[in-house]
Curated annotation (Swiss-Prot):
Protein name, as recorded: Bifunctional dihydrofolate reductase-thymidylate synthase
InterPro entries: DHFR-like_dom_sf, DHFR-TS, DHFR_CS, DHFR_dom, Thymidate_synth/dCMP_Mease, Thymidate_synth/dCMP_Mease_dom, Thymidate_synth/dCMP_Mease_sf, Thymidylate_synthase
Gene, per the UniProt record: DRTS
GO biological process terms, semicolon-separated: dTMP biosynthetic process; methylation; one-carbon metabolic process; tetrahydrofolate biosynthetic process
Keywords annotated in UniProt: Methyltransferase, Multifunctional enzyme, NADP, Nucleotide biosynthesis, One-carbon metabolism, Oxidoreductase, Transferase
Amino acid sequence: MAAVLANGDSQGRPQRNYQVVVAGTRDMGIGKDGVLPWKLPGDLKFFKELTLTTSDPVKKNAVIMGRKTWESIPVKSRPLPGRLNVILTRSGSFDFATVENVVICGSMESALELLASTPYCLSIEKVFVIGGGQVLREYLKGPACEAIHLTDIQSSIECDTFIPPVDFSVFQPWYSSFPVIESNIRHSFVSFVRVRKSVAETHESNGKESTEVDTKNDKFETENFSFLPKMVYDRHEEYQYLNLVEDIIRSGAQKNDRTGTGTLSKFGCQMRFNLRKNFPLLTTKRVFWRGVVEELLWFISGSTNAKVLQEKGIHIWDGNASREYLNSVGLAHREEGDLGPIYGFQWRHFGAEYTDMHADYTGKGFDQLMDVIDKIKNDPEDRRIILSAWNPSDLKKMALPPCHMFAQFYVENGELSCQMYQRSADMGLGVPFNIASYSLLTYMIAQVCDLSPGDFVHVIGDAHVYRNHVRALEEQIQKMPKPFPILKINPSKKDIDSFMASDFKLVGYDPHQKIEMKMAV
């Protein structure tokens, strides 16, 4: 393709949207003395794959850059192969006459107009803006910028060129890789998507409890995020859940179960969620966030009284706390609502003799949760930082033996990670709750211990779909994920027993509608 010169005149013609690709430090330093102040082969590989790959094999992508960025590319590597190189310059002396796959434009507006016109609108799949500093400072927040792909440099590196930070009122993380260290530089790859056209109203609670999502402020103006490159779009962590559900429905073993409902089942599954940039609350259906928070606080309090949750409008334990159910499992002597020595009791009073939900167990048994926190603070390399709800001697006293039964915590690089083992996992109703609950617990313990949240690893024994959930889940897996929300916690809370529901605030949760599924009891 011969080079073309487009002037800077704008006639209000249609323009292409674009996505920014940039590597930057925590204060958004992107260069020093006109070059990248780091050498990261992994970053170059990511850049090449992102900007070169197309879904349509007959199309190519375009990369837009300023003249200085073009000149900073080694001569042997320019133009960037397999891509249309669009160079922004007003210099009349710029020599382009013999360069193939290069277009010269006098402004960003003229470049975007040119790419929206024939033949480029038919041959160019995606448009990436790749630098330099002046271009990015002006167009990182431009209304046509639909995504930002950031190599997040987490090591301290001196820079003299900076760009504005990502505007979190407009953009939210879609995907964040787990951190890697290369050339002694810690970094990760983060893709942000535009969810609003302009700065949203401030996320105030307007008198609501913070655990209530403010749907007015959190409503996305963007509903479909398929504009992302497929390699990024498919990395949304919710696909771990959706793909597992689909696999179980398609090829799971047919099993009977204690409820008589019947399941499709797989054994030995794992999902891993990155807690550093956002919070894994599923978006392909609305998850009962207030219920997640109140139940976890109830566990932490050591309570076994389902009526405490009922009084807050949380009815997730009603089925296992009813008179009829307690009678059916040999607990007819137990008061209705008394669930026995379940999760919270084992977390805070392991080994104590359980009498009923009204007894005062202060100082009785072993407080596993406080032991976990003490070890994280004082012996973070301990490999025995364990929280277990599985107490064989108490199982027959429980209304329901623990499903999520065992958690191990791990400290590295100032971050706290959690791996939870779940013996039995109801993929439709339970697992979305469980992912959120243990991720929240990790956030809380991390804050108490002056750490940052790292990973949540979810290991499942019997992962099953109840037969009466199949149709609802088939509907759910057809939905397209949206960005996970961001969780903010009252930073003044440093005692695990001091948290209240109002200390937690979700920002940017705009899921698909609720999908009804009946609980098997």
